């Protein structure tokens, strides 16, 4: 199990990605074993990181009501990378003794290498997934091989929300950052304007981006999944625990998604202000578990959700919890499942 010190060093190594050229960045996305060194373009201190590591940050709370419009940009959409996840077909072997009970509406624990379902609860139910949506947003963004150094300016439309909902945000209209920083905001801090901006600046705009999300889901065999937008605010964004197990296994193959989604804390230097930002998953912030990928989600219709790719006793595993009644219940269930995994026979 890794400790919080290792997690903080993980952030230092991650920050250099933000200053990479588009070519080296694209190579890193699909070649997680490659290494780079240099000076980070965003600065933060270990003392600041320690101060914010245990804060109870969670998903931005949906609030208010706005009308939704979209902006269609010219250009053709990039070719969708439709490779299947490198896991065995999912098969249910959940007859283990002393399985923990969870409060989640749906749950899955899967061996990410063999595809064995170690724990299951309503795994085929199609339910709202809130900001777990942003994991597919990240995959589509990475597949597009766009210039990650390109500057993006947040526009009012990025704050418009979806389906009559918007959410609180520390970002502002007019904030400027490169595409890598936008992706980091979307994964680590679950900022909805960041996810909206990634869709808006995709070739073909939001309609092409959402089409790519659904095409990727179909290509991966996520048959209970459908996306209407890129943030997760729309409760019509639905999936199943089974489908999300496939998505997490796929997303874990992208080095950048792994690093950005498991960054515990980060200072975003926007030039005229610095945003101290924390990961929305307390298990990532607090350390102690070997979590390789993480994404949380919340809207009223979805409840509290989390997906993780972890390694326990040399076993790569996926954990999915959907529809938890509270953040505390979500964290407790995730911790209990991780502990239960650690007591299973070790992989040889």
Regions inferred by a protein language model and the residue ranges of each:
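Bacterial Sec-dependent N-terminal signal peptides
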Residues: 1-13
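Short alpha-helical segments used as structural interaction elements across diverse proteins
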Residues: 2-3, 131, 292, 327
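Short helix-onset patch at the extreme N-terminus, typifying the N->h transition
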Residues: 6-9, 32, 273
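N-terminal signal peptide c-region/cleavage motif recognized by signal peptidases
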Residues: 21-24
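Active-site-adjacent loops and short helices of periplasmic peptidoglycan-processing enzymes
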Residues: 28-35, 41-242, 249-255, 312
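Domain-terminus/edge residues, biased toward the C-terminal soluble/receptor-binding domains
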Residues: 222-226, 232-348
């Amino acid at each position: 199990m890794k400790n919080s010190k290792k997690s903080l060093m993980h952030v230092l190594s991650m920050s250099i990605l933000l200053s990479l050229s588009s070519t080296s960045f694209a190579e890193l996305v699909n070649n997680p074993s490659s290494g780079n060194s240099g000076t980070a373009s965003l600065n933060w201190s270990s003392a600041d990181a320690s101060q914010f590591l245990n804060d109870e940050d969670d998903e931005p709370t949906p609030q208010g009501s706005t009308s939704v419009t979209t902006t269609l940009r010219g250009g053709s959409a990039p070719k969708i990378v439709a490779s299947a996840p490198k896991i065995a077909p999912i098969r249910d072997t959940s007859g283990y003794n002393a399985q923990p009970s969870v409060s989640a509406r749906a749950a899955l624990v899967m061996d990410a290498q063999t595809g064995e379902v170690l724990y299951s609860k309503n795994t085929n139910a199609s339910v709202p997934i809130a900001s777990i949506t942003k994991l597919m947003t990240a995959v589509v963004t990475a597949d597009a091989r766009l210039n990650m150094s390109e500057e993006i300016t947040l526009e009012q439309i990025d704050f418009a929300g979806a389906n009559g909902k918007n959410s609180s945000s520390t970002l502002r209209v007019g904030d400027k950052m490169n595409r890598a920083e936008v992706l980091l905001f979307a994964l680590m801090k679950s900022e909805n304007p960041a996810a909206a901006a990634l869709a808006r600046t995709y070739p073909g705009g939001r309609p092409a981006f959402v089409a790519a999300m659904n095409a990727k889901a179909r290509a991966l065999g996520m048959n209970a999944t459908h996306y209407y937008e890129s943030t997760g605010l729309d409760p019509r964004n639905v999936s199943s625990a089974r489908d999300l197990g496939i998505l997490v296994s796929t997303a874990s193959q992208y080095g950048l998604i792994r690093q950005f989604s498991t960054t515990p804390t980060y200072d975003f230097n926007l030039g005229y202000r610095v945003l101290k930002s924390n990961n929305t998953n307390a298990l990532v912030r607090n350390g102690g578990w070997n979590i390789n990928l993480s994404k949380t989600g919340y809207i009223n219709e979805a409840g509290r959700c989390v997906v993780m790719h972890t390694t326990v006793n040399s076993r790569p595993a996926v954990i999915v919890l959907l529809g938890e009644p509270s953040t505390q219940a979500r964290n407790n269930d995730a911790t209990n499942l991780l502990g239960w995994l650690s007591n299973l026979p070790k992989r040889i």
